[in-house]
């Protein structure tokens, strides 16, 4: 019989540079005093994102595992999630009362999805700098993730993107699913993201 808790597993995906690691840093720093948190990061040949989170002091180093996927990072979160599942298990055994493990995918495209075996909830991050067309391009990350975050809204005027157009496209592409417009650098939208995690993840409100 296992002597540790099964944590809520939240997959965090999105293209390179969209703000996945920034999201994890701010979530860890905000939630770590209330909940027991750990993180698994995926990089192709390095443990760069794990190092970034450790250096930012988002969590203690023993709460972060960096998985080096080699080859295609999508496979490690979908078809063969064994390395990630093993990392989640290791963290759960190491910290027996974990509430949440975030699993950050390697930089992926709009078609990447998490295996249901690996993630109980999925958050997908895109950013305004990629252009206002991104939501209407669709793909499972846009249409099927449990929460979509449109990050870096402060850049809209500089890249000629209309947030109104992005919002109407997003609402059309995922009519029944939630989304948040955010500027994670400044903490804009963070309260809604945390509310989603606590409510949908059925975490005990503390």
Swiss-Prot record:
GO MF terms, alphabetically ordered: GTP binding; GTPase activity; nickel cation binding
Source species of the chain: Aliivibrio fischeri (strain MJ11) (Vibrio fischeri)
GO cellular component: cytoplasm
Oligomeric and partner information: Homodimer. UreD, UreF and UreG form a complex that acts as a GTP-hydrolysis-dependent molecular chaperone, activating the urease apoprotein by helping to assemble the nickel containing metallocenter of UreC. The UreE protein probably delivers the nickel.
UniProt cross-references to HAMAP family, sorted A to Z: UreG
GO biological process: urea catabolic process
Primary location recorded for the protein, binned into one broad class: cytoplasm
Protein localization: Cytoplasm
Keyword Nucleotide-binding: yes
Superkingdom, natural source: Bacteria
Known function: Facilitates the functional incorporation of the urease nickel metallocenter. This process requires GTP hydrolysis, probably effectuated by UreG.
Full protein name: Urease accessory protein UreG
Similarity field: Belongs to the SIMIBI class G3E GTPase family. UreG subfamily.
């Amino acid at each position: 019989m296992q002597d540790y808790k099964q944590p809520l597993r939240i997959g965090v995906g999105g293209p390179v540079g969209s703000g996945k690691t920034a999201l994890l840093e701010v979530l860890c720093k905000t939630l770590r005093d209330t909940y027991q948190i750990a993180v698994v990061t995926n990089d192709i040949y390095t443990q760069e994102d794990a190092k970034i989170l450790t250096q930012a002091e988002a969590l203690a180093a023993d709460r972060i595992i960096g998985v080096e996927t080699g080859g295609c990072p999508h496979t490690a979160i979908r078809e063969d999630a064994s390395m990630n599942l093993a990392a989640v298990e290791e963290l759960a055994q190491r910290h027996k009362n974990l509430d949440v493990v975030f699993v950050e995918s390697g930089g992926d495209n709009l078609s990447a999805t998490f295996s249901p075996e690996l993630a109980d909830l999925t958050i997908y991050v895109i950013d305004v700098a990629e252009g206002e067309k991104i939501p209407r391009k669709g793909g499972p990350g846009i249409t099927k993730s449990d929460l979509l975050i449109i990050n870096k809204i402060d850049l809209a005027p500089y890249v000629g993107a209309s947030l109104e157009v992005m919002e109407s496209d997003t609402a059309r592409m995922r009519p029944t699913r939630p989304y948040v417009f955010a500027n994670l650098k400044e903490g804009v939208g963070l309260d809604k993201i945390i509310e989603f995690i606590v409510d949908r993840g059925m975490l005990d409100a503390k």
